[in-house]
């Protein structure tokens, strides 16, 4: 199984939207479910295009052959928070525990360092122990929690706030 990590390009838009529907249906750890993201292929391609040559944002895809099996992004925050980037990641369930999350995160951290980010922020479900372990392995620290970050079927879901100080 050869996994490639690549920057997303506009021609990935349709496959990325399908991937997001897939992973949204595999876990309750994401901000969306099996409906995926509410964007057209054209809108997604435009969004990817806006990130393509940016030093403020990046979207990476993990691919096995031509299939998207993971996605990670880092978006620089505005104005007085511009030293920080907000991080998001997902990996298809069939590819969990194969090092893909680590590969994506390594590449995101390298991009952040190269482009003068000082802090990477993320939020993670408190019961997502695998993800928390991945982040801690890469140097992230817990800095707080939110007792009702998600609400799924009338149940409040607790999240941890974590950050990685780069400078």
Regions found by a protein language model. Give the residues of each.
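Acetyl-CoA-dependent GNAT
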Residues: 10, 24, 34-93, 105-106, ...
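Short glycine/proline-centered loop/turn elements that form peptide/ligand docking sites
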Residues: 105, 128-131, 148-153
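Conserved acetyl-CoA-binding loop-helix of GNAT-fold acetyltransferases
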Residues: 97-110, 114, 133-137
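A short beta-loop-alpha structural element at the N-terminal edge
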Residues: 4-18
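Conserved GNAT acetyl-CoA-binding A-motif
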Residues: 112-123
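Active-site acidic-Proline motif in GNAT/NAT acetyltransferases
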Residues: 89-94, 98, 126-127
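Terminal substrate-recognition subdomain of acyl/acetyltransferases
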Residues: 156-167
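Conserved catalytic-core motifs of GNAT/GCN5-like acyltransferases
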Residues: 121-124, 136, 141-157
């Amino acid at each position: 199984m050869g996994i490639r990590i690549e920057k997303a390009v506009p021609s990935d838009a349709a496959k990325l939207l399908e991937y997001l529907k897939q992973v949204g249906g595999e876990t309750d750890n994401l901000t969306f479910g099996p409906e995926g993201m509410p964007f057209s292929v054209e809108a997604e391609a435009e969004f990817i295009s806006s990130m393509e040559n940016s030093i403020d944002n990046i979207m990476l895809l993990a691919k096995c052959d031509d299939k998207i099996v993971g996605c990670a992004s880092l978006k620089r925050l505005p104005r007085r928070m511009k030293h920080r980037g907000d991080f998001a990641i997902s990996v298809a369930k069939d590819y969990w525990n194969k090092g893909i999350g680590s590969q994506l995160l390594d590449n995101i951290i390298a991009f952040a360092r190269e482009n003068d980010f000082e802090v990477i922020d993320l939020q993670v479900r408190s019961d997502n122990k695998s993800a928390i372990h991945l982040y801690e392995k890469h140097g992230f620290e817990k800095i707080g929690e939110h007792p009702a970050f998600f609400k799924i079927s009338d149940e409040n879901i607790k999240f941890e706030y974590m950050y990685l100080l780069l400078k």
